[in-house]
Amino acid sequence: MGAGALAICQSKAAVRLKEDMKKIVAVPLNEQKDFTYQKLFGVSLQELERQGLTENGIPAVVWNIVEYLTQHGLTQEGLFRVNGNVKVVEQLRLKFESGVPVELGKDGDVCSAASLLKLFLRELPDSLITSALQPRFIQLFQDGRNDVQESSLRDLIKELPDTHYCLLKYLCQFLTKVAKHHVQNRMNVHNLATVFGPNCFHVPPGLEGMKEQDLCNKIMAKILENYNTLFEVEYTENDHLRCENLARLIIVKEVYYKNSLPILLTRGLERDMPKPPPKTKIPKSRSEGSIQAHRVLQPELSDGIPQLSLRLSYRKACLEDMNSAEGAISAKLVPSSQEDERPLSPFYLSAHVPQVSNVSATGELLERTIRSAVEQHLFDVNNSGGQSSEDSESGTLSASSATSARQRRRQSKEQDEVRHGRDKGLINKENTPSGFNHLDDCILNTQEVEKVHKNTFGCAGERSKPKRQKSSTKLSELHDNQDGLVNMESLNSTRSHERTGPDDFEWMSDERKGNEKDGGHTQHFESPTMKIQEHPSLSDTKQQRNQDAGDQEESFVSEVPQSDLTALCDEKNWEEPIPAFSSWQRENSDSDEAHLSPQAGRLIRQLLDEDSDPMLSPRFYAYGQSRQYLDDTEVPPSPPNSHSFMRRRSSSLGSYDDEQEDLTPAQLTRRIQSLKKKIRKFEDRFEEEKKYRPSHSDKAANPEVLKWTNDLAKFRRQLKESKLKISEEDLTPRMRQRSNTLPKSFGSQLEKEDEKKQELVDKAIKPSVEATLESIQRKLQEKRAESSRPEDIKDMTKDQIANEKVALQKALLYYESIHGRPVTKNERQVMKPLYDRYRLVKQILSRANTIPIIGSPSSKRRSPLLQPIIEGETASFFKEIKEEEEGSEDDSNVKPDFMVTLKTDFSARCFLDQFEDDADGFISPMDDKIPSKCSQDTGLSNLHAASIPELLEHLQEMREEKKRIRKKLRDFEDNFFRQNGRNVQKEDRTPMAEEYSEYKHIKAKLRLLEVLISKRDTDSKSM
């Protein structure tokens, strides 16, 4: 050992490093997860695709959010309008970017996930509708007709970059699902366009931006309304061949022989697999693909299954080796307690199944090693076909990008009318395979199947182009090295049908019809639980295909060859396919019963619900007009749609307008307050920009504010009507009280009829308001006659007025016990005289108990007579005193000995005369801080030291000044009334603010002078 090596061994740092390495090696692989931060928000879509952070061309974060919202949020009321918690949204964002596995159901909620989706779109460096094309979108909607708009809009959408196009299509597809549930979530197309318009179009701030945003929202609504036309119009004549080939494709679910080779598809396994290096993009025009008519789509390896051609001589040996290999490794790889980790069939195209539990990294490594060894041993795999081992592993990734059959079945109803009409006539009999002459002609090429799925799925457009160029070389290798294979023919794939959405492939596996052919070439065996179906558009030509089967066999070419199921085993050993999940494997289950997927929990709960009828099959919406599907009792997952217990439309799922009528007063009040707040914000914003308050015409010019104003008036009217109904309802106790939050349809129809009958009976018994008033007045007249009380209040004494008050009070209580307080305008007008008389009597009694000190005219103001306040009418509390009508006689007779104390004897007539003089009230000037002339009077500070003659002289001067100012103010208010047709309000007094303030100070000084004179008079008498 050299000196250097000895020094390293003796170094403590080296020993410590060695110990640390031992610890790292000793830690299991599944505990060594290091989540690295990777920015997802605020990154361009092209960059996300380059980094491999997309699924089928859609950003992974968007994919996860939309999948979660599709399952849990479609019926959430106020979806996308109700914002999520800011902290929760930020935590979800950090988790996504740090690489931590995110479960939106546990870590967040529906509102937070919706807010996170809007945040992702909002933070894109270039908006979803790119800034380069946005002016053209806006210009298109500013001029042009409807038909021109639609065709031009379709062309503009095609000009979007691939990543933007795919995301826009995926987003619009999801939003159309949300709009279909607008009865529950209150989000129709226009509401969704209002929410997502600002997120898909980035407009500049300011007034111009607001106008531009309104147009962008209309564009978004147009895109959502015409989603099928704008995005699926690419299904043109160039796609006919592809449609027919895909329609004839046989997709086989899991077909397990008693034992099978386990192939685990978990998301954890997909993450650990090496990704193929990025490939350079070869520019190519969108129409170039249609010229290359004879190029074969060669797929990459899928699910670790190599490209192979099964020969008859290898079939039995393969099955025996697979049975023996499974016995050694199935116990390690597939736990019996986890049914979700069951192996998947190589023919099962959709690996987008719900996420299952991840096996440890060590188990994954072991599984991959064993699988590759078994494949090489069983299938004699070589990599000379242009696929490396990394490509083989990356095929698992491609399998995960497909949608599950269950999801395709659930989404099929969205493609009903468009696809049903479009697929008519897409028939090419030459491409219809009827069978195979020899077993050697049957190729089970899973890579071809998966590649067709991936190209039809189409959103990962850039990465699929170089693979298509490579496929021509592989085709030549197939012809050179493998004899007896079925010829291949490619699709005339244009750029337009590379970019088809995830829903364009839905009908491949779940919308087929079982066929039975007795031709001499091949027999297709089918069981009651597995039917291999054709596309419905091909059923009309089934007999013609049988007749031309001989010609087709010679010239038959297909993009994806059919698998002859007889090539897998002998006819005598043919068995039923074993379902992929153990929960489906029930020995006692009827073979004719449709199997439900593990995700059918919500369907089962709804079917087993006590008050609910069985739900319709999802296929009913897509093919509701086709009798061949209505009468097919074998169609999973539900019974036939023509059965008598078809679910009827519940009244609780009525239109939004019907539910509007059922709003409670509290809900109406909340909506009114919300609308008033929105209008107030608009007014404030308008005032900041224009420097003046918006008029009614300004509000009407804005469509949104005009809608708010109309809704506000409508809700106010409904609130008034609901209050009227409540006031007219009988207050008798009811047998059953229902919550206001439940729709009225939950109540029994019989109960509603009983309530209506009871209301009619009550209305028939209850007298009218006029009849009640007449009876009350008749009783009051009788009581007055019994007690010899005069009818005129002026002629009554104090005791008689007190008795009159009690009688009026009892009469009004009797009226309110029958009809309640007067609410409507008619009731108020009828009952106004009686209420006014009662109010006047009360005021006289309260006034009589307050004896003023001095008989000065100012004593009238110490307890002014308040006028009746009528509901719904504008009350004016600021009217002038008619003191000048007394003339100058009262003022000229003012002498030092004018003090006259009021007699203790009560006279109702003198009080009423005084009330008539005070009927117009008094002016209450605006509380302004403008300095008054009187405040600068130097004699004001010396009033306390002045003599009585000086005080009286000053009092006379102040009265003259008060009359002068009052006359000036009266002229101003009369002119204002003639010009505007209403009384002067406080905010209208600005031009005369100084006069009002001066008038206020003069009144205060007059009160002070009267108090001083009264005080001096009492002092002189006491002396």
UniProtKB/Swiss-Prot annotation:
Residues 666-730, 946-978 form a coiled coil. Pfam families: RhoGAP. GO terms for cellular component: cytosol. Residues 412-427, 509-524, 750-759 have a biased composition (Basic and acidic residues). Residues 384-405 have a biased composition (Low complexity). Residues 536-549, 738-748 have a biased composition (Polar residues). The modification Phosphoserine is found at residues 345, 597, 617, 727. InterPro entries: FAM13, Rho_GTPase_activation_prot, RhoGAP_dom. Isoform 1 is widely expressed, with highest expression in skeletal muscle, thymus, brain and lung. Isoform 3 is less abundant than isoform 1 and predominantly expressed in kidney, pancreas, liver, lung and thymus. Residues 269-290, 381-437, 459-562, 628-663, 726-759 are annotated as: Disordered. SUPFAM superfamilies: GTPase activation domain, GAP. PANTHER family: FAM13 (PTHR15904), PROTEIN FAM13A (PTHR15904:SF18). Belongs to the FAM13 family. This is Protein FAM13A. It comes from Homo sapiens (Human).
